[in-house]
Each structure stands twice: as structure tokens, then as C-alpha cells.
């Protein structure tokens, strides 16, 4: 495959992940994608034909992450960037809920929002070291401020900040590690099955656009295509070569507080 850049993206079947696939393809990258079901696979196949390497599976399963990387290498020959993007929300789950509900939701949210990032990076790392590649994680405005979710979700996204700093330090100079903190973005982000929120989608919440407008100094709710540019910067070997341990916020000023 020559010198063309290769990126692998988890959570690639909807929302920001789907827009990342589109943006990196438009930028000339080869792309491999991990999606959670056949419906998402069919959507990608319809749009991109056979241009992508697609794996269907559970991002919490380490064997699935290893499969994603193996198939990426088998098809494209190398890996330049791994984007850990899969995530779920907690729909403002309160600490006052029954403990069993909190405990199971906490485990599910941290397994997907935190542990799956470790798993994917672990699987990708041997190949990234070969290419002096990079990792980009999806953090959140909730990594920096409250109000964008319940305590389980906010805690999981704060954990991503620690992961970025620790891994950037540990893996330098071979591999760069950074993150993007989107906020105020209307997507199909679902919730935890443990709390019964897995069939819900943020974009379907009544009044979600107006709620975000009220929380965002710039005064509008973003779409996925509005928040992907920092990922391209951080993945770039040219523009991003001196960036590591950095988290770029793209939230319309939401972390600043209400205007």
C-alpha cells in the first residue's frame, strides 16, 4: 500500500465515529473500522463499497480489538493512527438510584469508555511502534466540566484525561498520544444496557438542540462533522508531529459555562 496513511477507528458506525471515517477517507487515508452490529456494517458498505476494512464486534472484547488490528495489517500493511472513539452515555444517571443499577451501569460505562481504550491501544501498540504512529482518544466536555452527564459518565471521561497524559509520557518518543474533547454535539450516542438506556439515542431527546444552545456560548448545537477537524490535526505526521499529551476541546465554549 506504499506510503499512504492508515487509520483504525472504533465506534465507527455512527455519530462522530462515522464522520471520522468520512473525513479520513476524504483526506486520503486507508481506513479500518470497528462497528457493533451488522446494521452499521451494511451502512458503511453501502456508502464506501469495499474501500474499508470492517470488523463487527464488541469493543470490550480484547480479541475483537486484536482482530481489528490484524485485519488492518493484513489488508493495508501498516498502521499509522489508532482512534479510540467508542462510547456510551449515562443519561444523567443519579447516585440516588438503587445501588445495583448504579454498579452495573458504572461497570458497563467504564468498560466501554475507558477499558476498551486500553484494550484497543494495547492491541495496536506493536504496529504503532513500527511506524512511530499515534493514538487519538475521544474525551468529552465532561472531561473538564460537570453538567454534560451523570457522575458515572463524567468520571469515565475524566479517566480518559489521565490515560492520555500517562500514556503520552510512557510511550514517548515512539508513539504520540492525544485526545479530542467534543461537546455540545447532537449524535446518536446511546446509553448503558444495564440501566435500560441502550435503545435510547441522544439525538432523539426532546428539546436537546435548545438545551445545548442554552449551555453553549456560541449558541448552537454542533453536528458530528463540526468536531472532527482536531482528529485530523492530531493524526497528521506533519502538522501534529510535535503534539503529545494534549487534549483539544471543541465544544462551542461549553466548558466555560453559560453565557
Swiss-Prot record:
One of the record's GO molecular function terms: oxidoreductase activity, acting on NAD(P)H, oxygen as acceptor
Keyword NAD (UniProt): yes
Keyword Repeat appears in the UniProt entry: no
Pathway(s): Aromatic compound metabolism; naphthalene degradation
Gene3D superfamilies cross-referenced by the UniProt entry: NAD(P)-binding Rossmann-like Domain (3.40.50.720)
Catalytic activity reported: (1R,2S)-1,2-dihydronaphthalene-1,2-diol + NAD(+) = naphthalene-1,2-diol + NADH + H(+); cis-1,2-dihydroxy-1,2-dihydrodibenzothiophene + NAD(+) = 1,2-dihydroxydibenzothiophene + NADH + H(+)
Active-site residue list: 153
SUPFAM superfamilies assigned: NAD(P)-binding Rossmann-fold domains
Keyword tags: Aromatic hydrocarbons catabolism, NAD, Oxidoreductase, Plasmid
Task of the protein: Catalyzes the oxidation of naphthalene dihydrodiol into 1,2-dihydroxynaphthalene.
PANTHER family xrefs: BENZIL REDUCTASE (PTHR43008), CHAIN DEHYDROGENASE, PUTATIVE (AFU_ORTHOLOGUE AFUA_4G08710)-RELATED (PTHR43008:SF4)
Name listed for the protein in its UniProt record: 1,2-dihydroxy-1,2-dihydronaphthalene dehydrogenase
Organism field: Pseudomonas putida
The gene coding this protein: nahB
